From Swiss-Prot:
Protein name: Ubiquitin-like modifier-activating enzyme 5
Cited InterPro entries: D-isomer_DH_CS1, ThiF/MoeB/HesA, ThiF_NAD_FAD-bd, Ubiquitin-activating_enz
One cellular component term from this protein's GO annotations in UniProt: cytosol
Highest taxon listed in the record's lineage: Eukaryota
Length: 403
């Protein structure tokens, strides 16, 4: 009897291990799916086994000069939710060198209307689940996760140090920060950190009704920071929690979040690889398919003191020299016309000189042929008409036969 109980307990323990294994790997069953081997260098070879062939084709089409430089870039993504998770997915598939993920939330079944996460990952932290999935998609990408709230005083300093020293080269800052958070407090924390360390970053968001979104490229001192023109909630110091009621949540569409994430990653790639035009602000209205673009200038009276410092530094930079093109003169290149050449408009009426006028030629030239002068008197042509003949037709016929 005791032996049978021991066998049952062993079977139960084995089943528990099998159930826990997918959770420990972020929902990826390692015994059924094996990740590919790492690739040391990107190749443009067009074969089915090359995951980078279609990306490297951008070089052949003269879109990007050196696509492999993306492996030298480090990007920090704050917020791994509806927009942030898709953003991380896209950058991973593009072969980014390093991703640093920040989030303190967990995956819930309520998140399944969005992209990326799967139901078997419910209960895991978002950064843990994302890291497991992203590593399986592209093991060449270095992924670093931070499971904490960046808005607290202690964690803000940790966040500041990470983005300042978390680049591909040890001790160097990240190349770009992407804000994919859903609250103003976190946006203000990212804004303060990037202003303090003078880091370029993208702010992004989707409206509560899920039918509009936007991205904004913020360059400290050059464009408006998030505190230069804050939303009403931030400007009035209203506690955002008071606006939320129990049983009420924001709407969410995977389409709007996917479009916003696509805009975000597209402009991030253009900035990192230096091709195309990076949009300072790009919006999206799903109801009318409207895409507004604009540039927001910094506020000289911004409440963020570091923003004021960056504005002064930007204004002190030497302005780029603009070479003005010389105006094309409409005066004739040569004042003298030695050969007597004249230009006549195509639509001008043709004017033939009268026979008595001699054509004008240059000095030292003479005409090879001169037309003879015509007499002013016109000859009259004499037209001789036969007199009327009264001979009949029969007589004429008889005369012709006798000839």
């Amino acid at each position: 009897m005791s032996h049978a109980i021991d066998e049952l307990q062993a079977i139960i323990a084995e089943l528990k291990t099998e159930l826990e294994e997918p959770k420990a790997t972020g929902g990826v069953a390692t015994n059924s799916r094996l990740a590919r081997d790492r690739i040391d260098r990107m190749s443009a070879e067009v074969v089915d086994s090359n995951p980078y062939s279609r990306l490297m084709a951008l070089q052949r089409m003269n879109i990007v000069k050196d696509y492999e430089r993306i492996r030298d870039k480090a990007v920090a993504i704050v917020g791994v939710g509806g927009v942030g998770s898709v953003t991380a997915d896209m950058l991973t598939r593009c072969g980014i060198g390093k991703l640093i993920l920040f989030d303190y939330d967990k995956v819930e079944l309520a998140n399944m209307n969005r992209l990326f996460f799967t139901p078997d990952q419910a209960g895991l932290s978002k950064v843990e689940a994302a890291a497991a999935t992203l590593s399986f998609i592209n093991p060449d990408v270095e992924i670093e996760t931070h499971n904490y709230n960046i808005t607290t005083v202690e964690n803000f300093d940790r966040f500041l140090d990470t983005i300042s020293q978390g680049g591909r080269i040890a001790g160097q800052p990240v190349d770009l920060v992407l804000s994919c958070v859903d609250n103003f407090e976190a946006r203000m924390a990212i804004n303060a950190a990037c202003n303090e360390r003078n880091l370029n970053w993208f702010e992004s968001g989707v409206s509560e009704n899920a039918v509009s979104g936007h991205i904004q490229f913020i360059r400290p001192g050059d464009t408006a920071c998030f505190a230069c023109a804050p939303p009403l909630v931030v400007a009035e110091n209203i506690d955002e929690k008071t606006l939320k009621r129990e049983g009420v949540c924001a709407a969410s569409l995977p389409t709007t979040m996917g479009i916003t994430a696509g805009f975000l990653v597209q402009n991030a790639l253009k900035y990192l690889l230096n091709f195309g035009e990076v949009s300072d602000y790009l919006g999206y209205n799903a109801l009318s398919d409207f895409f507004p673009k604009m540039t927001l200038k910094p506020n000289p009276q911004c409440d963020d003191r570091n923003c004021i410092v960056r504005q002064k530094e930007f204004q002190a930079r030497p302005k780029p020299v603009v070479i003005e093109e010389k105006a094309v003169s409409e005066e004739p290149l040569h004042a003298t016309n030695e050969w007597g050449i004249e230009l006549v408009a195509e639509d001008a009426p043709e004017s033939n000189p009268t026979p008595t006028e001699a054509p004008v030629v240059g000095e030292g030239l003479r005409l090879a042929y001169e037309a003879p002068e015509r007499s002013s008197e016109t000859s009259e042509e004499t037209v001789t008409t036969a007199p009327a003949d009264e001979t009949s037709l029969e007589d004429l016929m008889a005369q012709m036969k006798s000839m």
